[in-house]
Each structure stands twice: as C-alpha cells, then as structure tokens.
C-alpha cells in the first residue's frame, strides 16, 4: 500500500482520527503513523493525546506500516461510531 492509496481510502471511507505523517502535536484518540530514521511507527493516542502504552508497533517498511495504520484507523472509526 502507498501513501496515495491510504489517502484515497481515508477519503472514500470518510475515516477520521488519523495522523498520516503530519508534523504536529498528537490529538486525542487518534491513530498516528510516523517515520523516524527510516523506521516507521504506528500507535494510538488516548483521551489526553498521549501515546497509549503498548500500542506502538515498529516496521521496517513503509508499506507494512501503512497497512497496519489503515487497519487500525478503520477499527478506531468503528469504535467511535
């Protein structure tokens, strides 16, 4: 999966609560994907916008991280609705 494909899925499915490589502070109850030194991380935040302990997963490839991000973002949206 590519960033463009993820953006298309987010738009088509009207998914909310995702931080797709944005350089900003975390928001409450969102799924975050970030790249640090060619390693990709996906994690969830809580109601105080803090990283949820145990939620962070590290990936060696962007594709794996994006797959995980979109799966978890879909789940987050099911829980919110």
Locate each region found by the language model.
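Negatively charged, low-complexity tracts enriched in Asp/Glu with abundant Ser/Thr
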Residues: 1-26
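A structural signal for short, well-ordered beta-strand elements
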Residues: 55-59
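Intrinsically disordered, low-complexity charged/polar segments
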Residues: 75-81
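Short aromatic-glycine-(Arg/Gly/Cys) micro-motifs in beta-strand/loop hairpins
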Residues: 27-54, 72
């Amino acid at each position: 999966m590519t960033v463009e494909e993820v953006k298309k899925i987010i738009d088509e499915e009207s998914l909310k609560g995702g931080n797709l490589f944005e350089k900003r502070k975390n928001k409450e109850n969102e799924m975050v994907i970030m790249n640090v030194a060619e390693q990709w991380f996906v994690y969830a935040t809580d109601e105080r916008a803090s990283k949820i302990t145990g939620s962070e997963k590290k990936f060696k490839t962007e594709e794996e991280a994006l797959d995980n991000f979109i799966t978890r973002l879909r789940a987050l949206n099911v829980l919110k609705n």
